[in-house]
Curated annotation (Swiss-Prot):
Protein name, per record: Ribosome maturation factor RimP
NCBIfam families according to UniProt: PRK00092.2-5
GO biological process: ribosomal small subunit assembly; translation
Family membership: Belongs to the RimP family.
A GO cellular component annotation in the UniProt record: cytosol
Pfam families in the cross-refs: DUF150_C (PF17384), RimP_N (PF02576)
Function: Required for maturation of 30S ribosomal subunits.
Compartment list: Cytoplasm
Gene3D superfamilies per record: RimP-like superfamily, N-terminal
Biased amino acid composition, Acidic residues: 203-213
Region of interest: Disordered: 194-224
Alphabetized UniProt keyword annotations: Cytoplasm, Ribosome biogenesis
Native source species: Brucella anthropi (strain ATCC 49188 / DSM 6882 / CCUG 24695 / JCM 21032 / LMG 3331 / NBRC 15819 / NCTC 12168 / Alc 37) (Ochrobactrum anthropi)
Length: 224
């Protein structure tokens, strides 16, 4: 990423463009409030923060470039930058393991643009309150409008509406479901971005079998 491109992306993010509609609570929210401005300054977008009890305590930070990519070098840059900030702010009690990663193929959907980018693919969506008689939905993402998304169920059950419109402000959690179609599309988009081509171009069947290791791992550190 060149300095000029990074500066442009940071400016866009700082302006609040395409903010997350799904946010953390509790200690995760506290960590997110500390690191999100730092990550934005680097030209990346925060996807999710989650503190788990895995291996003692693990602080997982998912981030990405505005184009959806995230390399190993990107993960290392974010790690080196946010680690000292967390040391100073000290939002977490005790020792923890810091893990920086890309969102992955079956990624969380946290922005309105995420639903648009992955329209046509299957997602699981949970709402904060009962909506249309339930709180959990699964189905194909159909583009809605600025305030909602339409989900077309891929597993029709008795008494459930096959097509549901869900307001964005009711969504508490959402993520893509791993399918063969999703894997092919994700790899095609990644390939297109790396080659400077437009996602959706016919890139050939061989490209669907390729996956870069760069977006599969990140840097992790132990912090006191």
């Amino acid at each position: 990423m060149t300095e000029q491109v990074q500066a442009n992306e940071a400016e866009t993010l700082a302006a609040g463009a395409d903010e997350r509609i799904i946010r953390e609570t509790g200690i995760d929210a506290k960590v997110a409030s500390i690191i999100e401005p730092v990550i934005n300054t680097l030209g990346f977008r925060l996807v999710r923060v989650r503190l788990s009890g895995l291996n003692g305590q693990t602080l997982q930070i998912m981030a990405e470039r505005p184009d959806g990519t995230m390399t190993v070098d990107d993960c290392e840059l974010v790690s080196r930058t946010v680690a000292p900030v967390l040391d100073v702010e000290d939002p977490i009690s005790g020792k923890y393991h810091l893990e920086i990663s890309s969102p992955g193929i079956d990624r969380p959907l946290v922005r309105k643009s995420d639903f648009a980018d992955w329209a046509g693919h299957i997602a699981k969506v949970e709402t904060s309150v009962v909506h249309e008689g339930r709180k959990k939905f699964r189905g194909r993402i159909v583009l809605g409008d600025a305030e909602s998304v339409v989900i077309e169920s891929d597993q029709i059950s008795y008494g459930s509406e096959p097509v549901v419109r869900i307001p964005f402000d009711l969504i508490s959690d959402a993520r893509l479901v791993l399918t063969d179609d999703l894997i092919r599309d994700a790899l095609r988009k990644d390939k297109a971005l790396r080659e400077g081509r437009i996602p959706g171009d016919d890139l050939g069947s061989e490209e669907a079998g390729e996956q870069s290791d760069e977006t599969a791992s990140g840097e992790a550190e132990d912090k006191e």
